[in-house]
Amino acid sequence: MWDAKVDRAPVLALTGQVQTQVFGPGAFQDIDLKSAFEAVSKFSQPVLTTSNHAELMTLACKSAIVERDVAHLIFPDDVQTIPSDAKAGSPQGRIGEDVVVPSEDALEAASDLIQNAKRPIIVMGHGAVSARNAVIELAERLGAPVMTTFKGKGLIADDHPNAAGVLGRSGTPIASWFMNESDLILSLGSSFANHTGIDRSKPIIQVDFERMQLGKFHPVKLPIWGEIGAFCRAICERLDPRSDDRQVKELTERWAMWREEKRTRLAEERGQGVSSVALFDVLSELCPADAIIAVDVGNNTYSFGRYFETTGQRVLMSGYLGSIGFALPAAMGAWAATQDVAEFAGRKVVSISGDGGFGQYPMEFATLVKYGMNITHVLLNNAELGKISKEQRAGEWPVWETNLHNPSFAAYARLCGGHGAKVTETADLKEAIATALNADKPALVEVTTDAELV
């Protein structure tokens, strides 16, 4: 739930409780759940026999959706079995439109800044997820590169002419170069996290539908309160398309340079495991364009951010809490959405983790088999908590207690009833991943990787 809270993902948490007649004195399993959930939940209430049950549920749902936070209801055992003929609540008349159009003054000021900029760029964060098409349309009109935050990876496909990849520590030199060369930054739905690498010395137009996010960490040239899609559409109406396609041509050149650099890095294999460059090159080639990809934390995630080239995939990650073990449970949730939500029906679900991340929830692979969740899990096994080792070396400390004693994860997947394959040579990657992606049951590909080739 803390993951959901800091990533602003709505959650409705329903928890049980002992019967009301023994609640409070300290009976078996009697815990003050309201206090326990107080810090993580925006709304938390016990549901009693005399409560207005439909109204409490309506308020909980509204709090989760509007606040994009955790809402929590506590159900004592006896309340759960009370018969009721009360009418269920409805969102009708309870939630207004969520489109906030920026003021005319703000739009005019933004238009002037953009019109006078020679090298504008767009930084698209996860806050622009529902407005990504409008952002891309604006970028095309301006001839501007679009780089994403790491959490926003995939919001624009890397094969789009205006795409510049991910900005920051998990990103590409393409995005960094355009950031350095820019004379105006349009930040759309980005929180300015310290990993992102936005140059604060440059003029910034920041647009967000949450006023607290505007200039949150430092002043910006022009903070604009409004829905990002509404802003982009309004600016497109004010500005003529640019005839200068210089930056788009430079993007083509920079991508060619980066791909050549990746080929150079492929040659750095030291015989101590498969290079993550090779792995994500193959996955970029084979992963369906409409797939949903859940990534974990650690070196595997940094490599995914740099080397995986999106073609339309939806990416899920623990963006702000950085919870190790996130990928597989998130993939399970995404798979459930493919069964229930028309927008996601039929889409392939892939999860990516290191050995440390998979080790947090290994029994969930048996759950995949039990429920027929044909998720493909790609596991980078370097036999250590590689990110922690890297941080210890960077701090000039001894590398301490980061090595892992692992079983054969591929064999474990097979014992659970799924498909399991182990790859130790780059030449075997493509066939192994293709087979796993096409399996009609849960599949795991364990790839022995070099911890130092990130």
Where is each model-derived feature located?
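N-terminal alpha/beta PP-like core and its mobile active-site loop of ThDP/TPP-dependent enzymes
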Residues: 1-243, 286-289, 346, 367, ...
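Thiamine diphosphate
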Residues: 14, 22-29, 215-217, 222-225, ...
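A conditional alpha-helix N-cap/helix-loop micro-motif detector
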Residues: 53-54, 100-107, 168, 273-276, ...
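Well-ordered alpha-helical segments embedded in enzymatic catalytic cores
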Residues: 56, 105-109, 174, 231, ...
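Flexible, glycine/charged-enriched surface loops at secondary-structure junctions
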Residues: 70-72, 242-255, 269, 444
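A short, charged, Gly/Pro-tolerant segment at domain boundaries
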Residues: 76-81, 252-259, 450-454
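Generic enzyme active-site microenvironment
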Residues: 206, 294, 352-353
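Active-site diphosphate/adenylate-binding microenvironment
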Residues: 256-342
